[in-house]
C-alpha cells in the first residue's frame, strides 16, 4: 500500500497543491510553521476521517475560504482507491471512495491505513489513561469494523445512561437496567478486543523492543480493567454495573466499564509511566508504533503508510538507525527541519526530498 499523489485545495496554508509521492521514502524539509505537518494531517484525515491535531473540522479550512478539498490516490495490491473529501465551514462534509458516497466513517477506514508517530505521542506513555484508550481504539478501528460499530454504540448508550443517572427516579431505574444490559454486551466485546490487541503487541513488541535496546530491555503490555474473567466478561460487567449503581447515582456518571480502563507499559518489570526515563518512554512509543505496523500487515497483507512528524530529531542515533533501517518495505513520509543527522542512513535508500516554505513545496 502506498500513496501515489495528494491534491489539497484551501487546506490549512495550502491554496492549491498537487503532490506526487515516491512509494519509498519521502522527506519534507523546512522551518517550523511552513506547512510540513499539514501534509501529514491531510493524509491522516483521509485515513480515518479525523485530524490528529484538532476536533474541529473547520480548523482545516484556509482562514478566508468556505470549504476545503482533499483527494488522495492510494495504490493497493488488489484495487486502487481514490479518496475525495469535501469539508465545509457549516460543519458538513462529503466523502467518496472511488466515487461511491461514504455514509459512515467505518466505511472510510481500511481504504488507506496509516500509522503516525509524532512528538505528542509521548503522551500515550506519560499522561492520563484516556490517551492510552484512544491509542487502542484508533488502532482497533483501523482493522476491525465490528469494533468501531460496538465502540460507537457503547459511547452512545453510556451517554444516555449518564443522563438517566442525573434525572433518576423509580421509573428511570428500569431504563437503567436496560442500559446496563446493552453496556455489558458492547463493553465486553471492547474489553476482550483490547486485551487481544495487547496480547499481539506483547508478542511482536517484545522482539522489536529488544532490537532497539540491543537485548537490554524487556517490554510488557498489560490491560487494566475491573473484569477478571474475559471469557465471561459480559456477565461480570453486568454484575459490576449493578453493584456500583448507588455510587453512580451519587456521582451522576458511570464508574465502571471500558471507558475507565487503562493499560500498563512496563520495562524490565518497572512501570514506564512513573519510573521510566524519557529515553525509555520514547523507546516504548517507538515499539508501540512499529508493532502496530506489523499487526496491520499481518491482518490485511500490506504494510500501512508510515508518517513520521518531526520525531527523528527527538531520537538518539541508535533509535534513529533502527527507524531508518526498518522502513525499506514501507512507504514513509518524514518531516524534519534538516536532514544532516539522518542523511548518513538515507543515502543508500530510494528517497525523495521536498523543500517546504510558506505553503509551497519544491521537489529536489
UniProtKB/Swiss-Prot annotation:
Disulfide bonds: none annotated. The RecF protein is involved in DNA metabolism; it is required for DNA replication and normal SOS inducibility. RecF binds preferentially to single-stranded, linear DNA. It also seems to bind ATP. This is DNA replication and repair protein RecF. GO terms for biological process: DNA replication; DNA synthesis involved in DNA repair; double-strand break repair; SOS response. PROSITE patterns: RECF_2 (PS00618). It comes from Clostridium botulinum (strain Langeland / NCTC 10281 / Type F). The lineage of its organism: Bacteria, Bacillati, Bacillota, Clostridia, Eubacteriales. GO terms for molecular function: ATP binding; single-stranded DNA binding. InterPro entries: DNA-binding_RecF, DNA-binding_RecF_CS, P-loop_NTPase, RecF/RecN/SMC_N, RecF_2. Its main location: cytoplasm. Belongs to the RecF family. ATP binds at residues 30-37. Keywords: ATP-binding, Cytoplasm, DNA damage, DNA repair, DNA replication, DNA-binding, Nucleotide-binding, SOS response. It is found in: Cytoplasm. PANTHER family: DNA REPLICATION AND REPAIR PROTEIN RECF. GO terms for cellular component: cytoplasm.
Amino acid at each position: 500500500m502506498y500513496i501515489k499523489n495528494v491534491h489539497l485545495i484551501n487546506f490549512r496554508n495550502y491554496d492549491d497543491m498537487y503532490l506526487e509521492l515516491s512509494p519509498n521514502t519521502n522527506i519534507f524539509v523546512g522551518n517550523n510553521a511552513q506547512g510540513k505537518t499539514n501534509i501529514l494531517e491531510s493524509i491522516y484525515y483521509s485515513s480515518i476521517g479525523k485530524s490528529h491535531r484538532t476536533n474541529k473540522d473547520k480548523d482545516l479550512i484556509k482562514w478566508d475560504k468556505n470549504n476545503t478539498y482533499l483527494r488522495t490516490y492510494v495504490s493497493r495490491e488488489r484495487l486502487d482507491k481514490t479518496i475525495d473529501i469535501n469539508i465545509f465551514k457549516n460543519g458538513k462534509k462529503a466523502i467518496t471512495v472511488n466515487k461511491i458516497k461514504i455514509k459512515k466513517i467505518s466505511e472510510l477506514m481500511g481504504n488507506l491505513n496509516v500509522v503516525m508517530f509524532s512528538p505528542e505521542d509521548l503522551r500515550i506513555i506519560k499522561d492520563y489513561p484516556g490517551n492510552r484508550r484512544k491509542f487502542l481504539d484508533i488502532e482497533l478501528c483501523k482493522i476491525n469494523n465490528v469494533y468501531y460499530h460496538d465502540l460507537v454504540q457503547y459511547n452512545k448508550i453510556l451517554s444516555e445512561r449518564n443522563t438517566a443517572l442525573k434525572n433518576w427516579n423509580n421509573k428511570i431505574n428500569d431504563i437503567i437496567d436496560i442500559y446496563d444490559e446493552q453496556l455489558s454486551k458492547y463493553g465486553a466485546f471492547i474489553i476482550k478486543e483490547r486485551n487481544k490487541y495487547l496480547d499481539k503487541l506483547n508478542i511482536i513488541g517484545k522482539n522489536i523492543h529488544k532490537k532497539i535496546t540491543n537485548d537490554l530491555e524487556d517490554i510488557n503490555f498489560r490491560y487494566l480493567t475491573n473484569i477478571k474473567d474475559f471469557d465471561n466478561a459480559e456477565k461480570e460487567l453486568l454484575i459490576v454495573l449493578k453493584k456500583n449503581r448507588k455510587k453512580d447515582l451519587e456521582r451522576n456518571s458511570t464508574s465502571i466499564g471500558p471507558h475507565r480502563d487503562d493499560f500498563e507499559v512496563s520495562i524490565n518489570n518497572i512501570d514506564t509511566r512513573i519510573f521510566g526515563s524519557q529515553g525509555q518512554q520514547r523507546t516504548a512509543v517507538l515499539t508501540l508504533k512499529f508493532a502496530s505496523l506489523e499487526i496491520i500487515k499481518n491482518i490485511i497483507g500490506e504494510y500501512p503508510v508510515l508518517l513520521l512528524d518531526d520525531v527523528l530529531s527527538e531520537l538518539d542515533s541508535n533509535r534513529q538507525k533502527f527507524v531508518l533501517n526498518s522502513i525499506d518495505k514501507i512507504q514513509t513520509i518524514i518531516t524534519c527541519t534538516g536532514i544532516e543527522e539522518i542523511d548518513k542512513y538515507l543515502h543508500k535508500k530510494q528517497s525523495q526530498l521536498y523543500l517546504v516554505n510558506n505553503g509551497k513545496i519544491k521537489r529536489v
